[in-house]
Swiss-Prot record:
Gene behind the chain: murC
Catalytic activity entry: UDP-N-acetyl-alpha-D-muramate + L-alanine + ATP = UDP-N-acetyl-alpha-D-muramoyl-L-alanine + ADP + phosphate + H(+)
HAMAP family: MurC
Keyword Cytoplasm set for record: yes
Coiled coil: none
UniProt-recorded name of the protein: UDP-N-acetylmuramate--L-alanine ligase
Pathway: Cell wall biogenesis; peptidoglycan biosynthesis
Function, as annotated: Cell wall formation.
Organism annotation: Aquifex aeolicus (strain VF5)
Length: 454
C-alpha cells in the first residue's frame, strides 16, 4: 500500500548504464521517470523514446514533481538537484537501494564478482529467455538480442548485475547469488583486500534457505570462503572438483569447446560462441544457475553456442586497412590479460596493436605494478592519459610513467592517439581500443575518420 503512493522517479546521472537500466524497468512498469545527465548518449535517447523526460545539465528545477530521487555513485553530494531534493524533503537514495527495491518484487539472481559480471548476467538472461521463463533483465551492457540493457519480463525471475564497487550489492536480497571471482579492485572504497573478501563472504551468505549461491571454486579466495559457508553452494570450475565442471577443453576456430559435467554426470559438449578461457568460467556460472533452476542442458548448450558478446566486450567495430578494430571495456590488469589472451586465441599469428586508456587515478595507483606486468607483454602499445571518472589526482600517478615502464608509446590526447596508431600500424595487425572511459568513443571516431579518408 505505501509503495503504491510513489508514482514519479527522478534519476541524477540517468545516462549511466546501470541507472538507465533501472529507469527503463520503472518506465515499463508504468511509473513516470525523469532524469538528468551532463550529456546526451544512446541510453538517454532510448529512455526519451520510451517516455522519460530527459534534462541535459543539473539544475534544481529539473526535479519537477518527483517523489523519489535516485543518484549514481558518480554524482557528488553538492549536486544542485540533490540539494534541492533535500530542501524539499524528497527521499534521496543511491542506485543500489533502488535496485534492491526491484529485487523485493521478484526472485532475484544477482551476479557479482570483480570481473565477468556483464557477460555472465547476459549468458544467464539468454538461457532463461530461451527456456521460456521470461525474466526481467538489468545488465551493465547492451545485450545484442534485446538491443538494450534492460527488459521487464512477465516471469518471476529478475537477473541483474550486483555492483560491489561501493558495497551497495549488500543491500540486495537475492534468491541466487553468483560470484565469478574476487580480485584487488575498488580499493579506493574498501581500503584493503581483506575488506573486499569480507564483503563477498557476506554477499554469498545472504541467500535465503530456499536459494543458493553459485561460486567459482578455481578462484583461491572463493575456495576459502566456500569452506566457511553454511549456505547451499553450487561450485563451478575447470581445475577443481567442482559440481559444475568443464573437461577436455580444446581450441576450435579460436573458441573453446569443452565437456560439461554436473555432479559427476557428463551432460555433453559445448562449443562456446565467444572467445577466451575466462568466458568458459562465465559460461559455467550461467550453466550452474540454469541447471539448478531446472533448465535442460539442450537449452543451455544452444544458448551458449549462439551467444554473442554484450556491447563493449571484445566488440568488433570495423576495419582499418584490413585490420580488425575491436573495442573492449577492460580496465583492470586481470581483465586486460583475459582480453589479450582471447585475441591471441582468435589471431595466433598476428601482432596486437593496443590503445589503452587507464581508468581512475586510484586504480592506476593501487595496481600500478600489476598494470606494468600485463601491459609490457603487448606487441605494440599506446597508452593515453588517465580517464579521471570524477576523481582528482591526489595520488601523484601518471600515464606517462605507466607508458615508460610498460615499454609503450605515450599519446596525450585523442588526436595524438590516432596519429600514433597510423604510425605504428602494419598490415595484418589486430587493433584494440581498451578501457572504461572515453576510449570507446575514440574508437568510433577513429573508424569514421579513416573511412572518410578512403
Amino acid at each position: 500500500m505505501l509503495r503504491e503512493r510513489i508514482k514519479k522517479f527522478h534519476f541524477i546521472g540517468i545516462g549511466g548504464i546501470g541507472m538507465s537500466g533501472i529507469a527503463q524497468i520503472l518506465l515499463e512498469m508504468g511509473y513516470k521517470v525523469s532524469g538528468s545527465d551532463i550529456s546526451e548518449n544512446k541510453n538517454t535517447k532510448l529512455l526519451k523514446q520510451k517516455g522519460a523526460k530527459i534534462y541535459i545539465g543539473h539544475r534544481p528545477e529539473n526535479l519537477g514533481d518527483a517523489q523519489v530521487v535516485v543518484y549514481s555513485s558518480a554524482v557528488k553530494p553538492d549536486n544542485p538537484e540533490i540539494q534541492e531534493a533535500k530542501r524539499r524533503n524528497i527521499p534521496v537514495i543511491p542506485r543500489g537501494e533502488m535496485l534492491a527495491e526491484l529485487f523485493k518484487l521478484k526472485e532475484g539472481i544477482a551476479v557479482s564478482g570483480s570481473h565477468g559480471k556483464t557477460t555472465t548476467t547476459s549468458m544467464i538472461a539468454e538461457i532463461l529467455i530461451n527456456a521460456g521463463l521470461e525474466p526481467t533483465v538489468i545488465i551493465g551492457g547492451r545485450l545484442k538480442r534485446l538491443g538494450t540493457n534492460a527488459k521487464l519480463g512477465r516471469g518471476e525471475l529478475l537477473v541483474s548485475e550486483a555492483d560491489e564497487s561501493d558495497g551497495s550489492f549488500l543491500k540486495l536480497q537475492p534468491a541466487v547469488a553468483v560470484i565469478t571471482n574476487v580480485d584487488k579492485e575498488h580499493l579506493d572504497f574498501y581500503e584493503n583486500f581483506e575488506r573486499v573478501k569480507e564483503a563477498f563472504e557476506q554477499f554469498m551468505n545472504s541467500v535465503p534457505f530456499y536459494g543458493f549461491a553459485v561460486v567459482n571454486l578455481d578462484d583461491p579466495t572463493l575456495a576459502q570462503l566456500v569452506k566457511k559457508s553454511h549456505e547451499r553452494v553450487i561450485t563451478y570450475g575447470i581445475n577443481s572438483p567442482a559440481l559444475v565442471r568443464a573437461k577436455n577443453l580444446y581450441l576450435k576456430e579460436g573458441r573453446y569447446e569443452f565437456g560439461v559435467e554436473f555432479k559427476g554426470k557428463e551432460l555433453g559438449r559445448i562449443h562456446l560462441g565467444i572467445a577466451g578461457i575466462h568466458n568458459v568460467y562465465n559460461a559455467l556460472a550461467a550453466t550452474g544457475v540454469a541447471l539448478e533452476l531446472g533448465v535442460s542442458f539442450e537449452v543451455i548448450k544452444k544458448s551458449l553456442e549462439e551467444f554473442r558478446n554484450a556491447e563493449r566486450r571484445l566488440e568488433l567495430k570495423g576495419y582499418y586497412k584490413n585490420s580488425p578494430v575491436y573495442d573492449d571495456y577492460g580496465h583492470h590488469p586481470t581483465e586486460i590479460k583475459a582480453v589479450i589472451n582471447s585475441l591471441r586465441d582468435m589471431y595466433p599469428d598476428k601482432n596486437l596493436l593496443v590503445v589503452f586508456q587507464p581508468h581512475r587515478y586510484s586504480r592506476t595507483y593501487y595496481l600500478f605494478e600489476d598494470f606494468v606486468k600485463v601491459l609490457k607483454d603487448i606487441d605494440k602499445l599506446i597508452v593515453t592519459d588517465i580517464y579521471p571518472a570524477s576523481e582528482n589526482n591526489v595520488y601523484g600517478v601518471s600515464a606517462e610513467e605507466l607508458a615508460r615502464k610498460s615499454g609503450a608509446v605515450f599519446a596525450k590526447d585523442k588526436e595524438e592517439v590516432f596519429e600514433k596508431v597510423r604510425e605504428v600500424h602494419d598490415e595484418g595487425d589486430v587493433i584494440l581500443f581498451l578501457g572504461a572511459g572515453s576510449i570507446s568513443k575514440w574508437c568510433e571516431e577513429f573508424l569514421k575518420e579513416v573511412n572518410l579518408e578512403k
